[in-house]
C-alpha cells in the first residue's frame, strides 16, 4: 500500500500533509508533518497540483482557501473537529451589535464560514501576541472557551468575551489523571496544551501548542515527560527522541476524528 501511494503521488504531482494527530501510517507516507498552521503554510508554498490533507475538515478548508486553484483531497470526509462547530455565525453578529469596539478573534480550529466573519485568525502559539497587539478593547474569542480564558489571563488589559466551546479531548483530561501519572513518574515535567482546563494549566511545568511541546522535548536535557495532548503526537515524539520516555493521562486522550 505504501509503495502504491508513493507511486500515485509522483504520477499526479501530489503532496501529502499529515497532522501530528494523524495515525502513524499516515505520518509515515507524508511529505510534511506538523500542526494546522504549519501545514497551511506548507500548502500555500507547495508547487504540487494536488494536496492530500490527512487531518480534519477545517484543515482541508484552510488549504483550499489558500490554494483556490488546486485540488485538495481529504482521505476521510467524516474526519471533523467538533469544536469547529461550537459557535454559530449568528452569535458573531449579535456580539458586533452589542459591542461597537469589537474584534472577532477566531482560533484556526474553526470552519471556513466562521473565519470569513472574523477579523483575524490565530493559532494556539500566537493567540496571546495577536490579541495583545489588537487596537480593539473588546475581543470576542471563538470557538474555544479554554484557550480564550488562557489568553484572557495573559492579556488582562483586554475585555475578552469568551464563547462556550472546547476541544472535547483536551477538556476530558482531569487533575486526578495527571496526579496519578505524576505519582508514578515524579521526575517527568508536565507539558500541556492550552486547550486543557485552567486547573490543569496551573499545575503544569510548560504550556504550549503541539509544535511547541515537541520542540520543548527536543531541546530538554530531561529523558521523561508527561504529555497532555492528543496521543497521536506520540509517533513524532518517539521518532525524534527514541531515547526518551513519554507518559499520558489514562485513558489516553485520543480523537476519533483523526484516527479514522
How would you name each of these model-derived features?
Residues 1-227, 233-260:
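Active-site loop-to-helix "anion-binding N-cap" substructures in soluble metabolic enzymes
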Amino acid at each position: 500500500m505504501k509503495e502504491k501511494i508513493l507511486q500515485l503521488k509522483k504520477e499526479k504531482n501530489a503532496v501529502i500533509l499529515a497532522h501530528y494527530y494523524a495515525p502513524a501510517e499516515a505520518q509515515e507516507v507524508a511529505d510534511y508533518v506538523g500542526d494546522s498552521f504549519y501545514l497551511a503554510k506548507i500548502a500555500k508554498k507547495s508547487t504540487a497540483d494536488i494536496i492530500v490533507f490527512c487531518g480534519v475538515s477545517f484543515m482541508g478548508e484552510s488549504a483550499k482557501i489558500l490554494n483556490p486553484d488546486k485540488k485538495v483531497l481529504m482521505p476521510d470526509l467524516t474526519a471533523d473537529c467538533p469544536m469547529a462547530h461550537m459557535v454559530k455565525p449568528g452569535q458573531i453578529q449579535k456580539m458586533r451589535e452589542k459591542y461597537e469596539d469589537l474584534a472577532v478573534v477566531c482560533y484556526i480550529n474553526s470552519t471556513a464560514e466562521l473565519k470569513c466573519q472574523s477579523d483575524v485568525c490565530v493559532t494556539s502559539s500566537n493567540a496571546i501576541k495577536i490579541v495583545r497587539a489588537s487596537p480593539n478593547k473588546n475581543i470576542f474569542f471563538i470557538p474555544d472557551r479554554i484557550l480564550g480564558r488562557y489568553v484572557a489571563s495573559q492579556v488582562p488589559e483586554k475585555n475578552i468575551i469568551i464563547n462556550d466551546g472546547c476541544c472535547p479531548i483536551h477538556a476530558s483530561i482531569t487533575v486526578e489523571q495527571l496526579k496519578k501519572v505524576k505519582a508514578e513518574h515524579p521526575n517527568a515535567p508536565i507539558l500541556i496544551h492550552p486547550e486543557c482546563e485552567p486547573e490543569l494549566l496551573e499545575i503544569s511545568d510548560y504550556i504550549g501548542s503541539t509544535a511547541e511541546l515537541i520542540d520543548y522535548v527536543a531541546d530538554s536535557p530531561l529523558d521523561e515527560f508527561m504529555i497532555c495532548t492528543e496521543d497521536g503526537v506520540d509517533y513524532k515524539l518517539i521518532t525524534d527522541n527514541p531515547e526518551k520516555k513519554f507518559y499520558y493521562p489514562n485513558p489516553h486522550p485520543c480523537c476519533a476524528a483523526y484516527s479514522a
